[in-house]
Swiss-Prot record:
Taxonomic lineage from the root: Bacteria, Pseudomonadati, Chlorobiota, Chlorobiia, Chlorobiales
Organism the protein comes from: Chlorobium phaeovibrioides (strain DSM 265 / 1930)
Protein name: N-(5'-phosphoribosyl)anthranilate isomerase
Keyword Amino-acid biosynthesis: yes
Keyword Isomerase: yes
Stored PANTHER family: N-(5'-PHOSPHORIBOSYL)ANTHRANILATE ISOMERASE
Gene: trpF
Pfam family, one: PRAI
Length: 217
């Protein structure tokens, strides 16, 4: 079953609705530049009300590893998503002693999936999220990964590591993306929104239903 993550949560009602519809993980964006930015205290208030079996993921772009550790501890974040090229394998290894870590890559045409292995060996990270590349932009882009690039990242079989697909996914295209690439998980933010930071409950339900149907034989 393809795992699901809805990112850019800023409101309790959105988080509770997604949880009731069976989402696997919720993302809280701590990047100060994001239109979906949330403070650690606001995230904590939401997380305190959520069911225990929904993973709480923090998205980080500007913060140092020490700041990330502090935010995760305070807000009860269980997974740190390192959404910037600035984070090294050493940074990821430092954080892995405290939380699970997802390292994000934004592959362009020159990206080699073979580069994952040395990063994994040095950092201990086993989960990688792939978002669309857009020059000069960090964090989520809301655009789809080019098909030719995605095919390299998500080979037909035998791929090591947990590989998560992000970038431009919505209720209308997520099922085809799952059938085509068979990722471990799918991640969306803008694809289920009414406007940045405000989720549309009908789109959330439709997205999660599309994922379930795509996994049926």
């Amino acid at each position: 079953m393809t795992r699901t993550k809805i990112c850019g949560i800023t409101r309790l009602n959105d988080a509770l609705h997604a949880s009731s519809e069976g989402v696997d993980a919720l993302g809280f964006n701590f990047s100060r530049k994001s239109p979906r930015s949330i403070t650690p205290s606001a995230a904590k208030k939401i997380i305190d009300e959520l069911p225990p079996f929904v993973s709480k993921v923090g998205i980080f772009v500007e913060q140092s590893p020490a700041e990330i550790a502090d935010i995760c501890s305070y807000s009860k974040i269980a997974v740190a998503q390192l959404h910037s090229e600035r984070y090294s394998a050493a940074d990821a290894r430092f954080l892995k002693d405290m939380v699970h870590v997802i390292r994000v890559f934004r592959p362009d045409g020159s990206f080699s999936p073979q580069s994952l292995t040395p990063f994994a060996e040095e950092s201990g990270v086993r989960t990688f999220l792939f978002d669309a590349y857009k020059e000069g932009m960090e964090g989520g882009t809301g655009e789809e990964i080019e098909t030719s690039v995605a095919r390299q990242i998500f080979p037909a079989e035998g791929a090591p590591f947990f590989r998560v697909l992000a970038g431009g996914l919505n209720p209308g295209n997520v099922a085809e993306a799952i059938r085509q690439f068979r990722p471990y998980g799918v991640d969306t933010a803008s694809g289920v929104e009414a406007k940045p930071g405000i989720k549309d409950p009908e789109k959330i339900s439709a997205f999660l239903l599309a994922v379930r149907l795509a996994n049926q034989p």
